[in-house]
Amino acid sequence: MKLRLAEIFTSRMVLQHGKEINIFGTGETNQQVTITIQGQTATTTIINNNWLITLPALEISTDETLIVSTGLETITLSNILIGDVYFLAGQSNIEFKFKDCDSVKVDQEVCYDRYLRYYEVPQIEYEDENIKIPPIRNQGWQICDNQTINDFSAIGYYLAYYLRHDIDIPIGLIAVNKGGTSGSCWINETYLQKNQEIKKVYYDEYYQAIMNQTEAQEDLEIAKYEERVKQYQQKVALYQQTYPERNMSQLKKDVGHTPWPGPRGKKDFCRPAGLYYTMFKKICQYSGKAVIWYQGEEDTKNAYLYHQLLQLVIENWREDMKAQIPFIIVQLPEYDDDKNDNWPILRDAQQQVCREVPACYLVVTMNCGEEFNIHPQNKKTVGHRIFWRIKELFYD
C-alpha cells in the first residue's frame, strides 16, 4: 500500500499556528513514517494502514516545506503557510460563491493575495467501497487570485480579506458545506439518537420512509427530480432574458423557488448523518482556529427542535476535532417568504445556544436579507460582521 497523506494535505496549504497540529494519512501497516516541517521532526508507526502524527505548535511563517517519508517513499509538499485556519460550515449561504455576489465587479480585480488560501472539501454525496457520487477530483489548496476567487465562498473571502488587511497573518479557509442541508446531515447516528425528539423527527421518519425502496426506484425518482430542476432552470433563464433589470428577489417572487427537496434515498446527500461521513470526517482532525457556522434555513420547518440540534452539532464536532474549538454562529437574516413564520423561532434558538454553550458566539445579520430571495447577494456585509466578531474575540 502506497504512502499517502489525507486529501486535504497539498502544496499551498495553510496550517494552524500556535497549537498542536495533526498530520495524517495512510500507508503500509508496521512501516515507520517520519515528518519534518519548520525544523521539527516526528515519527510514528502505521497501524491498520492509518497513521497520525501530532506536532507541537508551529510559528507563523511562509514558504515552509513538509516532508513525509517511510525511507522507501517520500512525499514533499511546498509553499506552505503557517497562520490561522477557519472552517466555513453549513449550507448554501456560506457555500454561496464569490462570482454570484453583488460586489464581484468591484472587488475581483484587486483580490490577489498569495497569503490567502482556500480548500473546498469535495462534496461527495454518497460513497461505498465501489463508487463515489459524484466522482469529484480533489482540487487541493488554491491561492487567491482573480480566477480562483470565483469559486471561493463569498462570505469566507470577505472575512479573510478584512483579516488579512487588519491583522496581516496568513489565512486558510476550509469549505465544509453544502446547500440545502439540515444540521442532521452533519452529525453521526449516535448523536442523532441522543435526543428522542431529534431521533424521531430527523432519523426514524427518514429511514422508515425508504425502508423498502429499491435502488431502481431511487434512481427513477432522482431522474424525475432532475427533470423538474431542468425545467425550472429554463424558466429562470427565460425570465432573466426577458427582464434583465430585475433582481434575484423579484425573480424568486415571480418564478418561484428551485424545486426542493429532492427525493429521499440512500444516495440522497440530505440523508441524516450522510455528509458527516462523506465530508466532515475527512477533515475533522485538521487543526483550526474556529468554525464559522451559517446554517438553519433547511431546519426552519422544525425550528422548535433547532436549539437541541445545533447543540448536538457542536458537541459532535468538538468531540471529533478533539478540541473546544470556537463556533461563530451566523444568525439567519430577515426573509419574508417563510410560509411557516418559523425563522424568528430559529433565530432565537441560535441566540440561546450562544448564551448557553461555551465558546459559541453570535453574528447578527438582520438587514442583510432579501424579501423573497433565500440567498441574499450581499455577502460583503456579512463577511465584515464576522470579521469584527472574530477580531474582538481573537486579535484585540
What are these regions (language model features)?
Residues 1-396:
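Cell-envelope and extracellular/periplasmic
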